[in-house]
């Protein structure tokens, strides 16, 4: 039987977790759920444990990338065949997990849930952010030769070889955890497929990035992509 781990990074999500975990259990009750409490100041970890999930508490906030890396380390050490990363705030519809896993069944090594794929382009995004996302998508296409409609989506599934890779290589910087990870996987020679998903409003709570200057962070990401070219080249060399 294929062992699958659901990885859920969470920062101060005590309000949204009960409904999110309940809905998740209705879809994937047979899979293990790991909630990574990313230095929360509320009762996120306790709520996760009471709901039957495995809870890992970080002593301070690492950010989504750091939390996901912890989850991938856990999956690697405990022999999971596949891992799925999903938000704790309820914006990712757990029903999308089925499509992500089916993509792996059909040969993908990694599957990305796209908010902007055909038939799902109804996710509200501000003009500046949308333009920045398109620009990043163009960079990824230039570097990998593959077109992606949503390079910053955090709703993803990984097969075992990619778990092994990203458990040691997963970026921890904000936004790099999605875009740079995608580049790392493609440069290592793995196949990445997109599947359409739908996003929903948060179940509760306040977005942790509400006050983040997205323009500055996108510029930092661009600099990071340019600065990490040697690491990706090493991965491509290792694959060859």
Report each predicted region and the residues it spans.
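A conserved acidic beta->alpha catalytic loop
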Residues: 37-45, 90
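Catalytic donor-sugar/metal-binding loop of nucleotide-sugar-dependent glycosyltransferases
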Residues: 147, 170-173, 182-200
């Amino acid at each position: 039987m294929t062992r699958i781990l659901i990885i859920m990074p969470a920062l101060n999500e005590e309000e949204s977790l009960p409904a999110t975990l309940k809905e998740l259990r209705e879809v994937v009750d047979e899979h293990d759920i790991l909630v990574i409490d990313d230095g929360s100041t509320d009762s996120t970890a306790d709520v996760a444990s009471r709901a039957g999930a495995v809870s890992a508490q970080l002593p301070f906030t690492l950010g989504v990338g750091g939390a996901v890396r912890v989850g991938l380390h856990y999956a690697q050490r405990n022999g999971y065949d596949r891992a799925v990363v999903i938000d704790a705030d309820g914006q990712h519809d757990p029903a999308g997990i089925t499509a992500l896993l089916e993509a792996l069944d059909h040969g993908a090594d990694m599957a990305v849930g796209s908010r902007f794929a055909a038939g799902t382009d109804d996710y509200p995004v501000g003009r500046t952010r949308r333009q920045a996302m398109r620009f990043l998508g163009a960079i990824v296409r230039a570097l990998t030769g593959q077109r992606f409609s949503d390079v910053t989506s955090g709703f993803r599934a990984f097969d075992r070889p990619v778990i092994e890779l990203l458990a040691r290589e997963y970026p921890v910087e904000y936004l790099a955890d999605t875009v740079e990870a995608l580049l790392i996987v493609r440069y290592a020679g793995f196949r990445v497929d997109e599947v359409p998903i739908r996003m929903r409003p948060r179940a509760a709570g306040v977005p942790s990035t509400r006050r983040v200057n997205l323009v500055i962070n996108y510029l930092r990401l661009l600099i990071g992509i340019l600065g990490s070219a040697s690491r990706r080249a090493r991965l491509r060399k290792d694959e060859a």
